[in-house]
Design a protein with these regions (language model features):
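Helix-to-loop junctions at the C-terminal end of transmembrane segments
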Residues: 33-46, 134-135
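A membrane-interface helix-boundary motif in multi-pass transporters
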Residues: 129-152
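Multi-pass alpha-helical transporter architecture, strongest
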Residues: 146-166
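Cytoplasmic membrane-interface "Motif A"-like loop-to-helix N-cap segments
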Residues: 42-56
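Intracellular juxtamembrane helix-capping segments at the cytosolic ends
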Residues: 89-104
Length: 166
């Protein structure tokens, strides 16, 4: 979440270098999630994979919020970084695959670009809002809110018919 760097560096005292190192290492898990998620999306469908990854990400946020006693454990924080990166990779590639499926072939490049721009806009707005609500929520509360926001759009996956656009 947008709170992670503040929590890890300022509250848990990791330091910028240590946080950057482990965040960089966790990025490899995101790459693995993207590659593996692509294969799985081809096998079970991008809607189902997006739903599973979104639920997994929300669950990981709830577990993290509930396990405050483990926050001082470097292994727990690194595990959370890896899990978040991996599940985010699976989620994003599944959403990308779904966006490609629902794009109308005649204007697919333009339509897909618009979908990607909206996904990037939502991430940017989310990061920006983090600063605005920082004083209103505890770190634990932020992760609970993140879990709720992660689950909020998932029911929309049920009404998307990838074959309707074609």
């Amino acid at each position: 979440t947008g709170y992670s760097p503040v929590l890890i560096v300022e509250e848990l005292g990791w330091g910028v270098e240590k946080n950057a190192t482990w965040t960089g290492i966790a990025t490899w898990a995101g790459l693995g999630g993207s590659i593996g998620g692509g294969f799985l999306a081809d096998r079970v469908g991008p809607r189902r994979m997006a739903l599973l990854a979104g639920c997994g990400l929300a669950l990981s946020y709830l577990v993290f919020a509930d396990a405050r006693g483990l926050w001082r454990s470097d292994s727990f924080i690194v595990g959370m970084m890896v899990a978040e990166a991996f599940l985010s990779g699976v989620l994003f590639v599944s959403i990308f695959a779904l966006c490609m499926q629902v794009s109308w072939p005649l204007v697919a490049a333009t339509q897909f670009t618009a979908y990607m721009a909206l996904l990037n806009l939502s991430r940017t707005l989310g990061q920006g809002l983090t600063v605005e609500v920082a004083d209103l929520v505890t770190f634990q509360g932020a992760y609970v809110v993140a879990a709720g926001l992660q689950l909020l759009p998932l029911p929309l996956l049920a009404i998307i018919d990838p074959h309707q656009a074609r």
